[in-house]
């Protein structure tokens, strides 16, 4: 991409540098194998060294760090060490805000927020959480994740939509609530025995989810596609009867900060059901452009799925309104414009000092 330079920093033996690779993110990597904890100091030091080197060798107008920890912390610490007076913008995507709840980590997050010229979060619910931590509301902007809703995630009338397929897309991790969806399936199948569930995604819970499908005697009704390239997702959304995203709050308090796949599905005019977490309120207006089901409750989820399967007219209305609503709010052109405004505001404030 023109104007974009990617600098990769080494932090371990190359064949072991998998801490931030696919598989559910760093937190889930740590859960999958405790040996990954040994890499964290090297990861932090490698990133710190790379950022300090850049700050000392080049001139920047702004630093934009994604995630409060570790990237926000590394950026703030690098500025402190180099004594560079460069404004810092931090974006929280949810996992860093809702997880990492120890007192020391909470203090660290507040320190990063205090060192930031501005903060962006991906949902209104997250802004409330940040403000509750003592951050000035004027310092926080809600800018959701963007989606290519005009080129990639679009409807295609030539693709025949099925009448017997539920679709889930996402990482196979606790916060996605797939166990709830699997537990809801027997009730759905009791009324719609020909229904199938397609799961597009990979992650550390795959084996456990396959075992659960076996225990529920629905193995022959569930298709695990594994990791699916992004350019293959639109046709999955276009063919599915409806998409289901049963997001939950985990025992440790982790929850979805936004739910990008919900926007992707709606962009393809696929009717959507999602768990009723606070972050979903920015995307789904229940009964208007999608349906919300009580989070963490398999029977309630099954009833919501059946309600939508029973009503083709409702599915068509939600699909149309869903597409219309997300294009107005989440297309990349809209999101890029919002970030440009924040960048200009921060840089101009720095110039006035």
Locate the predicted segments by residue.
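Acidic donor-binding loop of glycosyltransferase active sites
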Residues: 238-253, 270
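Carbohydrate-associated surface elements
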Residues: 125, 146
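Conserved acidic donor-binding segment of nucleotide-sugar-dependent glycosyltransferases
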Residues: 286-287, 291-298, 307-313
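Short alpha-helical donor nucleotide-sugar binding micro-motif in glycosyltransferases
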Residues: 227-228, 235-240
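A short, well-ordered alpha-helix in the C-terminal region of glycosyltransferases
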Residues: 194, 300, 307, 314-329, ...
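Conserved donor-binding/catalytic core segment of Leloir-type glycosyltransferases
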Residues: 159-186, 198, 243
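Short hydrophobic beta-strand element within catalytic cores of glycosyltransferases
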Residues: 262, 267, 271-274, 284
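Nucleotide-activated donor-binding/catalytic signature segment of Leloir-type glycosyltransferases, i.e.
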Residues: 207-231
